Regions:
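Two-component/phosphorelay signaling modules centered on CheY-like receiver
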Residues: 11-29
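Acidic catalytic/metal-coordinating carboxylates
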Residues: 32-36, 59-62
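Short amphipathic alpha-helix used as the core "switch/output" element in two-component signaling
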Residues: 39, 61-73, 90
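Active-site beta3 strand of CheY-like receiver
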Residues: 44-50
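Receiver (REC) domain active-site loop signature in two-component systems and cognate sites
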Residues: 55
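C-terminal output helix
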Residues: 104-114
Length: 122
């Protein structure tokens, strides 16, 4: 079972998304900020991170930078309400595999998740 970590400060979104992902066969968990993300990732590697950009403390860009610095190899999909072109380009340059704007369509998100996770299997 593939594991997904949701990193977002919106507790309601995290709870709903975790439930939706678990229902379709993923092992999903969530944390509410960048600091918690590194505590989690240090102890339990995951296949994919769904990452918000705007959070208190360490934001999504900080998380992307730190993933690279600490050489934590995991796929990242940015999932954010701040869907401007510059953020998408900057995220890609920092290693994000894809970029989805909120509000998201779960079916489209699921297609993107499957696409990103399958890249290693090609």
């Amino acid at each position: 079972m593939e594991t997904i970590l949701i990193v977002d400060d919106d507790q309601n979104l995290c709870s709903v998304l975790k439930e939706e992902l678990n229902e379709v066969g993923y092992d999903a968990e969530f944390v509410n900020n960048g600091d918690e993300a590194f505590g989690y990732l240090t102890n339990k590697p995951v296949d994919l991170v769904l990452l918000d950009l705007k959070m208190p403390g360490k934001d999504g860009f900080d998380v992307l930078r730190e993933l690279e610095m600490k050489e934590i190899k995991t796929k990242v999909i940015v999932l954010t309400a701040y869907a401007d072109v510059k953020s998408a380009i900057d995220s890609a340059k920092m290693g994000a595999s894809d970029f989805i704007s909120k509000p998201y369509d779960f079916d489209e998100l699921l297609i993107t998740i499957r696409k990103v996770l399958q890249k290693d299997n090609l």
